[in-house]
Swiss-Prot record:
HAMAP family: PyrH_B. It comes from Clostridium botulinum (strain Langeland / NCTC 10281 / Type F). GO terms for biological process: 'de novo' CTP biosynthetic process; UDP biosynthetic process. UMP binds at G54, D72, T133, G134, N135, P136, Y137, F138, S139, T140. ATP binds at K12, L13, S14, G15, G55, R59, Y166, D169. This is Uridylate kinase. It catalyses: UMP + ATP = UDP + ADP. Allosterically activated by GTP. Inhibited by UTP. Transmembrane segments: none annotated. Homohexamer. It is an enzyme of class 2 (transferase).
Length: 238
């Protein structure tokens, strides 16, 4: 196995990633596979922060008949459920973890405190950041970019259901072209589906590369941190 390319990473998992092929709820076997890969990262000496979406339970934009703010807060609560599920899965493997939330719920998690999060990472604890940014109208992608900047992560590992960034939906178009490398400006100008524009701009301003790869094989997480050719790398230099 190659030496790790990064010392501190931010892993962004969609809620759908925890649901596996089900698309809703939890696939505990698949969640365990992801946790096993995270454990390997820790064993390699890599400090791991994680942000989990809530799309397997609720999406703010799904509540079209609801007040947007209320729908977004429901989505934040969904990310907390996912964070606890991931924490439990990791701890069953003997991985020390902490969940920190942007909205205080001290009975189940710590409030987000940057210095405390940094200390946990230095002590080889996986820190799972939940409830997004704590504000409506911001996605969990933006939360991942924000927390990555705050903890000074070397890279955002963006695990998706597709194996990189394409010029159009590869599930709909057989001639979709995959990119190996992109600049942030290209992503924004072409409206490519990496992160939303707020998250992408935040990464660009703070020079945080984004590595987009597929979770069809959980071992891709290891490949991503050891520098293997995988997915699409988005950075300030193409």
């Amino acid at each position: 196995m190659n030496e790790p390319k990064y010392k501190r990473v931010m892993l962004k998992l969609s809620g759908e990633a925890l649901s596996g092929e089900k698309g809703f709820g939890f696939d505990f076997d698949f969640t365990k596979e992801i946790s096993e890969q995270i454990k390997k990262l820790v064993d390699m000496g890599i400090e791991v922060g994680a942000v989990v979406g809530g799309g397997n339970i609720w999406r703010g934009r799904s509540g079209s008949e609801m007040d947007r703010t209320t729908a977004d807060y429901m989505g934040m609560l969904a990310t907390c459920i996912n964070a606890l599920a991931l924490q439990d899965s990791l701890e069953q493997l003997g991985v020390n973890t902490r969940v920190q939330t942007a909205i205080e719920m001290k009975e189940i998690a710590e409030p987000f405190i940057r210095r405390r999060a940094m200390r946990h990472l230095e002590k080889e604890r996986v820190v799972i950041f939940a409830s997004g940014t704590g504000n409506p109208y911001f996605s969990t992608d933006t939360a991942a970019a924000l927390r990555a900047a705050e903890i000074e992560a070397d890279v955002i590992l963006l695990a998706k259901k597709v194996d990189g960034v394409y010029d159009k939906d590869p599930h709909k178009y057989d001639d979709a072209k995959k990119y190996n490398k992109l600049s942030y400006i290209e992503v924004l100008d072409q409206g490519l589906q990496v992160m939303d524009s707020t998250a992408t701009s935040l990464c660009m301003d703070n020079d945080i590369p984004i590595l987009v790869f597929g979770l069809d094989e959980p071992c891709n997480i290891i490949k991503a941190v050891t520098g293997e050719e995988i997915g699409t790398l988005v950075s300030n230099s193409k």
